């Protein structure tokens, strides 16, 4: 099975801190990232799907409720682009 090395963007770091301040269950996000880094598919509950338009080439999965993770797989890297609510990620 192919594994990926996580690569974090500056926006993702800011998003992550915002989620922590909101006291969201960060272990849920970390679990999803761990699954993706192992090269495994996420369960259906994550509603993992490709994005289009400005985000073409990226994927989005739902961590819980309105909480999403936007990522991209490139070569051996899992690029963590954004995380937060839909408004946080797609309205800026």
Which residues are covered by each model-predicted region?
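Enriched for short, Lys/Arg-rich terminal
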Residues: 1-5, 11-17, 21-27, 31, ...
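A short, surface-exposed loop/turn module that caps and links secondary-structure elements
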Residues: 35-62
């Amino acid at each position: 099975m192919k594994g990926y090395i996580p690569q974090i963007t500056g926006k993702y770091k800011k998003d992550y801190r915002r989620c922590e301040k909101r006291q969201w269950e960060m272990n849920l996000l970390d679990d999803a990232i761990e699954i993706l880094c192992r090269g495994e598919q996420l369960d259906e509950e994550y509603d993992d799907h490709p994005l289009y338009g400005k985000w073409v080439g990226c994927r989005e999965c739902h961590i819980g409720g309105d909480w999403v993770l936007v990522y991209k797989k490139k070569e051996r890297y899992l690029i963590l682009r954004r995380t937060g609510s839909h408004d946080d990620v797609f309205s800026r």
